Amino acid sequence: MKILLLEPYFTGSHKSWAEGYQSNSAHEIQIISLPGQFWKWRMHGGAITIAKEFLQLDFDPDLIIATDMLDLTSFLSLTRERTSHIPTVLYFHENQITYPWSLTDRDVQEKRDVHYGFINLSSALAADHVLFNSKYHLNSFMTGGKKILKHFPDHQELDTIDKIQSKSRIYILV
């Protein structure tokens, strides 16, 4: 199987996981990544750069695996002519709903800290399959996701959590 792995924050544990998966898998894995810096910008703009790189790449994957740092909805909308028929998996190595924030972060101080979690939610909704690395991680994402949606004044779309849950699994990639 030919797998395209998308990682916009290629450093530390993200890099170790991606390279470990690539080197230990029986599948042919092509990684498109960006340097592991400016994590907020990677979550906003990384999909645009990665989409551009993918469209220039001579690689036709059977499966696309994106990590939680990618805005999968933006990537898919920018690459639909090549990706509309390819199954997608969103892999949560971590997530921005339950990841601890620094109290000195300006987004926390200005009460804007739900935006990155919402990117994770919309990406999970857009993916065909959603994988988590532990049961705790899956459960805390679903609970936290519902809490984020309840934060909004209307059209909370709480049923989207059930849709995400129905296509979510705990999985160690091999």
Regions found by a protein language model. Name each.
Residues 126-167, 172:
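A short, active-site helix/loop in glycosyltransferases that binds the activated sugar's phosphate group
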Residues 1-38, 42-61:
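N-terminal subdomain of nucleotide-sugar transferases
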Residues 2-4, 55-78, 84, 89-91, ...:
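Short N-terminal targeting/anchoring amphipathic segment
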